[in-house]
C-alpha cells in the first residue's frame, strides 16, 4: 500500500500519524522484511501489526552466484510451494534486477523455461517489491535499474504492475527513476494501448523473436491472437506518442530465426521506427530443443541490420555458468518435490 493508504489503515487501528512515516520508511527505504526489525516501535505495537497488518513474506529458497561475473540468481518463495525468480546483475552504472511479475507464465513461448513449470498466479505489488528489497538486503547494495522481464507477462498482470511502478518510483521509497525501468511484453496489444494512456517514461521492450507471422506463431503462441499486423502498428503508435525508443528483444535461436533472410525481414519490419534491436545469445535449457546461434551467425545478422540502418546491440551474456534463464530454478525445485 502507498503512504496514504498506510496512514488510513493505521488511523483505523487508533495509531498516531507519525507511526505511518516510521513504518513506511522501514518498509520502503530500509527494506525491512519483518516488524521485529522496526526497533523504534514498541514491542506491543509490533505484535499488533503482525496480527492486523501482516507483511507479505519473500524468502530466498535458492541462490546461485556466477563465478564468471558475479551475477546472482534468486529463487524466491511466497509460501505454499509458490516460487518466482529474479536475477541481479552488476554493470558499470550500478545494479540492475530482473524481476518476475507472475508465478509461471501462460504465454507458452516454446524457447522459454518460465512456461515449463506451469502458471500459478499473478504476483501482488508487494511481492514484486519484495524481490527487490530482499536482494538489496542480501547483497547489501542499492539497485538503480529494474527490468520487468522475469517470469510472467507484465501486461497480463496490468493493475498490480502499475501499482508496483507507483510504489517503486515514490520519492519516499526507493525513488527509482521511471527512465531506469524497462517493461517487457510478448505482445499483448490491448495492454500496450493501455500502457500508452499512462504516458510513463519507462522503456517498453517487445519480445519479438521472429520477423514474420508464420515463424512467430510457431514459437510464440501469443502471435496467433495478436499477430504482427496488430502488434507493429501498436508499437509505432507507442513510439510516436511517447517519443520513447522501443527495444525489440530477439533471442538468437540457431537454425530457427537467425538466417540472413530473417535479418532482412526484421530490417523491413522495423524500418523508420524509433527503436533498437537487442539480440540475445540464449542460455541452453536442457528441456528445450533450441540451441544458441554461433558467434559468427550473430555477427552476420548484425551486419545485415546495420547496413539497413537498424540500431542493434548484443545483450551482454551474464550468468552463463549458472541457471540464469528465467524458470530454470523453479522447474528444478518443482521436480524435487
Q: What are these model-predicted stretches?
A:
Residues 66-67, 100-101, 114, 184, ...:
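Short linear Ser/Thr-Pro motifs
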Residues 72, 84, 95-99, 107, ...:
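Generic beta-strand structural signal
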Residues 136-145, 150-308, 312:
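Conserved AdoMet/S-adenosylmethionine-binding subsite of the radical SAM
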Amino acid at each position: 500500500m502507498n503512504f496514504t493508504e498506510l496512514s488510513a489503515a493505521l488511523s483505523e487501528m487508533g495509531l498516531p500519524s507519525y507511526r505511518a512515516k516510521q513504518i513506511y520508511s522501514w518498509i520502503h527505504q530500509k527494506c525491512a522484511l519483518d516488524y521485529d526489525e522496526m526497533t523504534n516501535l514498541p514491542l506491543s505495537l509490533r505484535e499488533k501489526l503482525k496480527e492486523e497488518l501482516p507483511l507479505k513474506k519473500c524468502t530466498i529458497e535458492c541462490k546461485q552466484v556466477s563465478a564468471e561475473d558475479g551475477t546472482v540468481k534468486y529463487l524466491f518463495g511466497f509460501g505454499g510451494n509458490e516460487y518466482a525468480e529474479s536475477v541481479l546483475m552488476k554493470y558499470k552504472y550500478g545494479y540492475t534486477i530482473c524481476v518476475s511479475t507472475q508465478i509461471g507464465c501462460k504465454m507458452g513461448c516454446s524457447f522459454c523455461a518460465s512456461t515449463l513449470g506451469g502458471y500459478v498466479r499473478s504476483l501482488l505489488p508487494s511481492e514484486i517489491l519484495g524481490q527487490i528489497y530482499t536482494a538489496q538486503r542480501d547483497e547489501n547494495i542499492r539497485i538503480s535499474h529494474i527490468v520487468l522481464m522475469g517470469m510472467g507477462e507484465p501486461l497480463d498482470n496490468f493493475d498490480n504492475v502499475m501499482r508496483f511502478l507507483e510504489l517503486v518510483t515514490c520519492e519516499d521509497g526507493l525513488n527509482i527513476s521511471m527512465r531506469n525501468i524497462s517493461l517487457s511484453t510478448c505482445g499483448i496489444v490491448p495492454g500496450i494501448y493501455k500502457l500508452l494512456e499512462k504516458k510513463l517514461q519507462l522503456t517498453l521492450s517487445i519480445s519479438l523473436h521472429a520477423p514474420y507471422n508464420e515463424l512467430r506463431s510457431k514459437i510464440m503462441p501469443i502471435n496467433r491472437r495478436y499477430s504482427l499486423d496488430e502488434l507493429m502498428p501498436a508499437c509505432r503508435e507507442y513510439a510516436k506518442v511517447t517519443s520513447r525508443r522501443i527495444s525489440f528483444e530477439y533471442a538468437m535461436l540457431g537454425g530457427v530465426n537467425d538466417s540472413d533472410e530473417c535479418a532482412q525481414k526484421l530490417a523491413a519490419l522495423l524500418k523508420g521506427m524509433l527503436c533498437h534491436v537487442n539480440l540475445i545469445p540464449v542460455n541452453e535449457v536442457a528441456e528445450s530443443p533450441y540451441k544458441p546461434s554461433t558467434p559468427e551467425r550473430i555477427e552476420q545478422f548484425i551486419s545485415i541490420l546495420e547496413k539497413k540502418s537498424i540500431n542493434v546491440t548484443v545483450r551482454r551474456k551474464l550468468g552463463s555458468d549458472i541457471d540464469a534463464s528465467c524458470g530454470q530454478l523453479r522447474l528444478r525445485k518443482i521436480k524435487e518435490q
